[in-house]
Swiss-Prot record:
<feature type="binding site" description="type 3 copper site">
    <location>
        <position position="1050"/>
    </location>
    <ligand>
        <name>Cu cation 2</name>
    </ligand>
</feature>
<feature type="domain" description="Plastocyanin-like 1">
    <location>
        <begin position="25"/>
        <end position="207"/>
    </location>
</feature>
<keyword id="KW-0813">Transport</keyword>
<feature type="binding site" description="type 1 copper site">
    <location>
        <position position="347"/>
    </location>
    <ligand>
        <name>Cu cation 4</name>
    </ligand>
</feature>
<feature type="binding site" description="type 1 copper site">
    <location>
        <position position="304"/>
    </location>
    <ligand>
        <name>Cu cation 4</name>
    </ligand>
</feature>
<dbReference type="Pfam" id="PF07732">
    <property type="entry name" value="Cu-oxidase_3"/>
</dbReference>
<feature type="binding site" description="type 3 copper site">
    <location>
        <position position="1008"/>
    </location>
    <ligand>
        <name>Cu cation 3</name>
    </ligand>
</feature>
<feature type="binding site" description="type 2 copper site">
    <location>
        <position position="1006"/>
    </location>
    <ligand>
        <name>Cu cation 1</name>
    </ligand>
</feature>
<keyword id="KW-0406">Ion transport</keyword>
<feature type="domain" description="Plastocyanin-like 4">
    <location>
        <begin position="571"/>
        <end position="719"/>
    </location>
</feature>
<dbReference type="InterPro" id="IPR045087">
    <property type="entry name" value="Cu-oxidase_fam"/>
</dbReference>
<dbReference type="Pfam" id="PF07731">
    <property type="entry name" value="Cu-oxidase_2"/>
</dbReference>
<feature type="binding site" description="type 3 copper site">
    <location>
        <position position="187"/>
    </location>
    <ligand>
        <name>Cu cation 2</name>
    </ligand>
</feature>
<feature type="topological domain" description="Cytoplasmic">
    <location>
        <begin position="1136"/>
        <end position="1159"/>
    </location>
</feature>
<dbReference type="InterPro" id="IPR002355">
    <property type="entry name" value="Cu_oxidase_Cu_BS"/>
</dbReference>
<dbReference type="InterPro" id="IPR033138">
    <property type="entry name" value="Cu_oxidase_CS"/>
</dbReference>
<feature type="glycosylation site" description="N-linked (GlcNAc...) asparagine">
    <location>
        <position position="935"/>
    </location>
</feature>
Length: 1159
């Protein structure tokens, strides 16, 4: 080798190493915002049924033009992708993407550059979820203290351009447990709800390293990928509503935009902008791997239960065929398509299904040599009939909680159980699945004592992986019915779905008097995953008319179990008790037997008005297995029994259920809880080993559901022969807490809305109704009652809240305890009416025999004791500390809305320091997201007297008045008035998110600029967390992005109603610590919070990091050295190349370790 050859190799190695250092992929997109007309039903018919829309009254409401109806075509603004900066050639997208913007893809380490041009007639922006951005690339308008160049991204005027730069940093990477590509979105964020309803939203996929092709950007790990947005597109919120009225209504001057029916006609229940099966069908082949990227957007009623007929999939390590989506919920599900045919994709929420939220997908036999696994397990036979029955929702005749008769005048149950001139009462004709012993259907199978609790539910169907189920169905009722199962595999011969797919499906319509045998298989591909419980809970139901059939009563539980889990008699090994609970509002107005029930039970049936609101309400039965107000039998167990609870949801968008187990906790995928959320067609399995004997409630914590009867009793007996020694408790932590009445201001500063300048359809600011005091609106100040901590039992001196607790605001003190501790609450009631203090998740002494803790009268002092057993602390998969809540239970609804609520944090042993604060994190924050309904407060009359100066008895309580009293608050503050969410850069924070409330309290909590981890069995990455009544969660957020950032609920109405604030991450430039859970003392709160622009100090953006002066200097030195090395390398390579060309007589190629030496 020539003498200089090693030097050349060294320089080339240096060059390639430096290239790798700075060689991140920049993925550049040219995006234009264009206005166009969008048709929600381009095929002009219901593709699922094949019928014309004129044959469907409800479809006509949405799709037919008229004097005051827009029809199916609307003007929208959409994102479109172009080839280059001339924006002259559009890059086509797959038809199934609908009006969504193009799919943007990147993997960890890449940089996304968006060149946006606004071709529309009004300003818009582009804001991403799931990636890093600086203030000049956030694309969101809100009061964040920035100006100048950091405001230019907030809105792009018509005809203008803007470039957004989003590095995909490691902190936003999918976790090992996440799918290879996480689903995110981008959307315009000037007025996000209106911008999105106008059409400006698209998918953004962030993948693990090595998943994307470096040049094409396509995935190399799956065969197919599809993106679907499920949302109720509210065209009433569109910026183009007036144009659409003028252009499409045949008599636009007759339109009343406030009319409820007109508004409903503009709410499009769509998949990517398509209704009633007009969604272009995604195609795939049997055996292919498919990634479904699903997300929701919208409002309080955007609760979606997405059901993929015919196949199952994995979602966050869990096997299922249904996932739930909410506004700004993003999911990646992974499917192996194994079942050929045309299958439906639907939202199983009744109202949404009826309004057209359904499409189809095709699984083709692309190869002739497809292998189908042979079922080697048992053949399990069931003989099930549909039988008409007279059902009693409360056979014991009284409210088991209050002891009152169900028809007691003025009681909560009176509306549902009083029979009369315009009321049916508590008995209805229904239809139920009943099990028989054989195919003759002459002898019913006797229910055992363990099955007494099933009520209206059909028999439990169970199978293990490898089994075949043969279900013979006899229709002994008087209507056409069927059986359709979740969670198993069936071919088209046993398909009971009602869609037209080219197959004759006799099992889809079994007439009265007929029988049909369904064959369902349980191959390995539908098995519970390693992280799933031994048996997955599903349901089966009649699908001839799935809304009417299930409202009539046809639903039952189905279990799919791992191999070897079931005993010979069908019970689960290692389980002592199994209970199956269906939580649903049975809407008897939708039953097939509604007219018959009117004729049978109403005293004057011909005078009834079926549209009367109170009559309609009286027929909505808030039941558990068809029982109300504690009338369900059979929920009995022994202390230390191993109990498996199988919980099922069904119904419509108000069927949002937060199921709470009083007195004991449940185990969910490695976590400890006492509650879980249920939605239509969702089912889950939870385990309990009760350690607390007594009589307890299992109930829905969604506030109206609780008062309307959706609660039952379960009893835990000591069974002394099975009672182990009691757990001993060590440290006693004592707190002096009082309930006291205060004047509370939800919005002392009203500048937030003025800065955002959001207006509604009438040109008024959205916040006016909540913040302004008029002759009919109370304004932002209310009398309330709150928990406050005192220094000692004299209750004279309130314990001052340190700066780290400033953010608690309305909430009571943050109580910390470790497993094995006892919490002693010395409680004084300084208010004017009785209250109490009770905590979820703990072992409350003196409870369990009277359903609620003792009340404390005004002026009294009472002691409450809470033990923290192991099951009240974090589970194996939980973070070190988990949240619960404490509140008053004298009247849970009114007490809570009046203000009595606080956080209880339970931790593993050794986590708390000597001051009772966490030693393992830098900051902790507790946030309660709740629409405080002041109409339900104990103090409403007081507030009317004081702030309106009117007599409450004479005051007319209009709809506007009641709306003005619904405060969409975070810790009791609205429109940016919650302060104290401050932390330093590069610190670990834990946030305790608390959900309480009613059907409107669906909250999707979005953190701008940061992502976080939440744990189920493993850790998962998100920047939005879904919160529901009765549910609580710890999220772990590493704060590494300095600035003031938006924190808000992503539900459209909640944004406009002020459920927003900001949090601030301070730079470490001065080593300032505003306050920290781990600091030795409590530092003073900083006088001012610095903005994202530091006056007089230049900043350098370097590989996704803002550098101060010292860092910038070091970076410049490094760049200079790299540049010098590259220059030297280039010169040497050039000289060597010239030398090589001149040496024509050189015969032999010398080699070193690099193939590039041939140059």
């Amino acid at each position: 080798m020539p003498r200089k050859q090693p030097a050349g190799c060294i320089f080339l190695l240096t060059f390639l190493g430096l290239s790798g250092l700075v060689g991140t992929v920049t993925r550049t997109y040219y995006i234009g915002i264009v206005e166009e007309y969008w048709n929600y039903v381009p095929q002009g018919k219901n593709v699922i049924t094949g019928k014309s829309f004129t044959e469907d009254k409800l479809a006509t409401l949405f799709l037919e033009r008229g004097p005051n109806r827009i029809g199916s075509i609307y003007k929208k603004a959409v994102y479109r992708r172009f080839t280059d900066g001339t924006y002259s050639i559009e890059i086509p997208k797959p038809p199934w993407l609908g009006f969504l913007g193009p799919i943007l893809r990147a993997e960890v380490g890449d940089v996304i550059v968006i060149h946006l041009k606004n071709f529309a007639s009004r300003p818009y922006s582009l804001h991403p979820h799931g990636v890093f951005y600086n203030k000049d690339s956030e694309g969101a308008l809100y009061p964040d203290g920035t100006s100048g160049r950091n405001k230019n991204d907030d809105m792009v005027p018509p005809g203008k351009n803007y470039t957004y730069v989003w590095p995909v940093r490691e902190e936003y990477a999918p976790t090992p447990a996440d799918a290879n590509c996480l689903t995110w979105v981008y959307h315009s964020h000037i007025d996000a709800p209106k911008d999105i309803c106008s059409g400006l939203i698209g998918p953004l996929l962030v993948c693990k390293e090595g998943i994307l092709n470096r040049y094409s950007g396509t995935r190399n790990d799956v065969d197919r990928e599809f993106v679907i947005m499920f949302t109720l597109v509210d065209e009433n919120q569109s910026w183009y509503l007036n144009e659409n009225i003028k252009h499409f209504c045949t008599n636009p001057d007759s339109v009343d935009k406030k009319d409820a029916v007109f508004q409903r006609s503009n709410k499009m229940h769509a998949l990517n902008g398509y209704l009633f099966g007009n969604f272009p069908e995604p195609d795939m082949c049997v055996g292919e791997s498919v990634s479904w990227h699903l997300f929701g957007m919208g409002n309080e009623i955007d609760i979606h239960s997405i059901y993929f007929y015919g196949n199952t999939f994995i979602s966050r390590g869990h096997r299922t065929d249904v996932v739930n989506l909410f506004p700004a919920t993003f999911l990646t599900t992974e499917m192996i398509a194994e079942n050929p045919g045309k299958w439906m994709i639907t939202c199983q929420v009744s109202d949404h299904l009826q309004a057209g939220m359904l499409g189809q997908y095709n699984v083709d036999n692309c190869k002739s040599d497809i292998f189908y696994p042979k079922m080697k397990g048992q053949q399990r036979r069931y003989f099930i009939a549909a039988e008409k029955i007279l059902w009693d929702y409360a056979p014991q005749g009284y409210n088991k909680f209050s002891g009152l008769p169900l028809n007691a005048s003025g009681s909560d149950s009176d509306l549902y159980f009083t029979q009369g001139d315009n009321r049916i009462g508590g008995k209805y004709w229904k239809v139920r699945y009943t099990e028989f012993v054989d195919a003759t259907f002459t002898k019913r199978k006797r229910l055992s004592a363990e099955e007494a609790h099933l009520g209206i539910l059909g028999p439990v169907i169970k199978a293990e992986v490898g089994d075949t189920l043969l279900v013979t169905f006899a229709n002994k009722a008087d209507k056409v019915y069927s059986i359709l199962p979740h969670g198993v595999i069936y071919d088209k011969a046993s398909d009971a779905a009602p869609n037209l797919d080219g197959f004759v499906k006799p099992g889809a319509h079994v007439k009265p008097g007929e029988t049909f045998t369904y064959k369902w298989t349980v191959p390995e591909s539908v098995s519970p995953t390693a992280g799933d419980p031994p048996c997955l809970t599903y349901l089966y139901f009649s699908a001839v008319d799935p809304i009417k059939d299930t409202s009539s009563g046809l639903v039952g539980p189905l279990l799919v179990c791992k191999k070897g889990v079931l005993n010979a008699d069908g019970t689960q090994k290692g389980i002592d008790k199994e209970f199956y609970l269906l939580f649903t509002v049975f809407d008897e107005n939708l039953s097939r037997y509604f007219d018959e029930n009117i004729q049978k039970f109403i005293w004057h049936p011909f005078s009834i008005d079926k549209e009367d609101k109170e009559f309609v309400k009286s027929n909505r039965m808030h039941a558990v297995n068809g029982y109300m107000y504690g009338n369900q039998p059979g929920l009995n167990m022994c202390k230390r029994d191993r109990v498996s609870w199988h919980l099922i949801g069904l119904g419509t968008d108000t069927d949002m259920h937060g199921i709470v187990f009083q007195g004991n906790t449940i185990h969910l995928r490695g976590t400890h809880r006492d509650s879980l959320a249920l939605f239509p067609h969702m089912a889950t399995t939870a385990f309990m080993q009760p350690d607390h004997a007594g009589i307890f409630r299992v109930f829905c914590a969604t506030m109206p559901h609780l008062s309307r009867g959706m609660g039952q009793i379960y009893e835990v007996s000591s069974c002394d022969n099975r009672d182990p020694s009691e757990q001993r408790y060590g440290m006693i932590r004592t707190f002096y807490i009082a309930a006291e009445e205060v004047e509370w201001d939800y919005a002392p500063n009203k500048n937030w809305e003025f800065e955002k300048q959001h207006v509604d359809a009438r040109g008024e600011r959205h916040g006016d109704i909540f913040m302004n005091r008029t002759e009919n609106w109370i304004g932002s100040q209310y009398k309330k009652v709150v928990y406050r901590e005192y220094t000692d039992g004299e209750f004279v001196e309130i314990k001052a809240r340190p700066p780290r607790e400033e953010h608690l605001e309305l909430l009571g003190p943050m109580i910390h305890a470790e497993v094995g501790n006892t919490v002693l609450i010395i409680f004084k009631n300084k208010a004017s009416r009785p209250y109490s203090i009770s905590a979820q998740g703990v072992e409350e002494m003196d409870s369990g025999k009277q359903f609620q803790v003792p009340m404390t009268k005004p002026g009294e002092v009472k002691t409450y004791r809470w033990n923290i057993p192991k099951r009240s602390g974090p589970g194996p998969s939980d973070p070190n500390c988990i949240p619960w809540v404490y509140y008053s239970t004298v009247n849970f609804v009114k007490d809570t809305y009046s203000g009595l609520m606080g956080p209880l944090i339970t931790c593993r042993k050794g986590v708390l320091n000597e001051k009772g604060r966490r030693s393992d994190v830098d900051y902790e924050f507790a946030l309660l997201f709740l629409v405080f309904n002041e109409n339900e407060s104990w103090y409403l009359d007081d507030n009317i007297k004081k702030y309106l100066n009117k007599d409450p008895r004479d005051f007319k309580r209009t709809d506007d008045f009641e709306e003005s009293n619904r405060m969409h608050a975070i810790n009791g503050k609205i429109f940016g008035n919650l302060h104290g969410l401050i932390m330093n850069e590069d610190t670990m924070t834990n946030w305790y998110l608390l959900g309480i409330g009613s059907e409107v309290d669906i909250h999707t909590i979005h953190y701008h600029a940061e992502s976080f981890l939440f744990k189920i069995d493993k850790s998962y990455r998100e920047d939005v967390y879904d919160l529901f009544p009765g549910t609580f969660q710890t999220i772990e957020l590493f704060a590494d992005h300095p600035g003031t950032w938006l924190l808000h609920c992503h539900v459209s109405d909640h944004i406009h109603a002020g459920m927003e604030t900001t949090y601030t991450v301070l730079r470490n430039i001065d080593n300032r610590i505003p306050y920290s859970t781990t600091s030795p003392g409590v530092a003073s709160h900083p006088a001012t919070v610095p903005s994202n622009e530091r006056p007089g100090k230049e900043q350098l953006y370097f590989f996704g990091k803002n550098l101060g002066p010292t860092g910038a200097k070091a970076a410049l030195v490094i760049l200079f050295i790299i540049g010098l090395l590259l220059l030297i390398t280039t010169v040497i390579l050039s000289l060597r190349l010239c030398s090589a060309m001149k040496q024509t007589d050189y015969q032999q190629v010398q080699s070193c370790a690099l193939p590039t030496d041939a140059l």
